[in-house]
Regions:
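WD40-repeat beta-propeller superdomains and closely related acidic/aromatic-rich repeat-like regions
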Residues: 1-343
């Protein structure tokens, strides 16, 4: 029994088991299918209505999968792994329609642009940009260290992080549009929907963020651990952060968050491992190393209350909202995929 208790707005729907620790998941745009990849290199496609496994490829990436990105416009998705390959999949076929050979080295980050025209990836100290058909468009010079995260500010600008630096590239040319320096190791990245705020969790147990419109930067310190989980809501008003047992929520309303007190959501018994806002509104899902999942209703000042909860057997690897916000998927360390309806 992997699901011990469900309360509030969460209603049990279905669950399934994959062969190894889950790496990432994603819903198709219409919510009709859920795709999951695992650390053994497996790819699984589930019919989301009932949890039926439509198809799987257990050894898609030799050595294991490391990243996955759903196409934002079409029904396909892309995976990458330790084998130095990027695979572009069509949902209707249990085989990739395109294989990009990076060569030696792990492909650790992967993300489609918002318009689906370009694919960004990173391996080691370099990032590469590909067209939708897999043709390489450009690659960066080596970063100062291994690229830790990628993000798209919009369809024209892509962001990378590494030790000591955030770099904004022109997606068409690879030219540097802007750089932000910080003496520390940046371990996570979240971008506000309007592209103005770049937030990073740091190895020194702080959250650092920059505003492009003003050039100002700020640091929020005092976390008991590394803030590896960050998430903005769809309006850019709230930034939810991990870094301990509590979810710390900073409000960018008015002149915040500088000089304000954050909201603190305190129900988890162990460190936060994953955070995700619903597509619309101020509803947040949190998962922790305690196997607990909570759904929170937040206010614009960052304060909130729990609306639903579920207990699983193992650490939460990821929580992922269906595009309509009416279902939530969770992946736990035992390889269990759990889906709840959200009322």
């Amino acid at each position: 029994m992997t699901e011990k208790k469900v309360t509030g707005v969460l209603q049990s729907d279905w669950s399934a088991v994959i062969q190894d620790y889950p790496i990432a998941s994603g819903w198709t745009r219409d919510g009709g299918a859920l795709v999951v990849c695992d650390s053994a290199g497996g790819v699984y496609v589930f019919y989301a209505k009932v949890g039926e496994l439509l198809w799987s490829e257990r050894c898609a990436h030799e050595g294991g999968a490391l990243a996955m990105s759903m196409h934002p416009v079409e029904t396909g998705f892309t995976t990458a792994g330790q084998d130095g390959k990027i695979l572009i999949w069509d949902l209707s076929e249990a085989r990739p329609r395109c294989c990009i050979e990076i060569g030696s080295g792990w492909v650790e980050n992967l993300l489609w642009s918002p318009d689906g025209a370009q694919l960004a990836s990173s391996h080691g100290r370099e990032i590469q940009i590909f067209a939708a058909d897999g043709t390489e468009q450009w690659r960066s010079a080596e970063h100062l260290s291994t690229v830790s995260a990628l993000g798209w500010l919009n369809s024209e600008e892509v962001v990378s992080t590494c030790y000591g630096r955030v770099t904004i590239f022109d997606a068409a040319t690879g030219e540097h549009n802007e750089r932000f320096e910080w003496k520390g190791s940046l371990v996570s990245l979240a971008l506000s929907p309007d592209g103005d705020v770049i937030a990073c969790g740091s190895q020194d147990n702080s959250v650092h963020f920059w505003r492009r419109s003003t050039g100002e930067d700020s640091m929020m310190s005092g976390y008991p651990g590394k803030p590896t989980a960050l998430a903005f809501d769809s309006t850019g008003t709230l930034l939810a952060t991990g870094g301990g047992e509590a979810v710390t929520v900073w409000s960018f309303e008015g002149n915040g968050p500088e000089g304000t007190y954050p909201g603190s959501l305190e129900l988890h018994e162990r460190a936060i491992s994953t955070l995700s806002f619903a597509p619309d509104g101020l509803t947040l899902a949190s998962g922790g190393r305690d196997g607990l999942v909570f759904v929170w209703s937040l206010q614009s000042d960052g304060q909130g209350r729990p609306e639903g909860a579920a207990m699983l057997e193992s650490v939460l690897a990821e929580v992922c909202w269906r595009p309509d916000g009416k279902a939530l998927a969770a992946l736990d360390g035992d390889g269990v995929v759990t889906v709840w309806k959200v009322s």
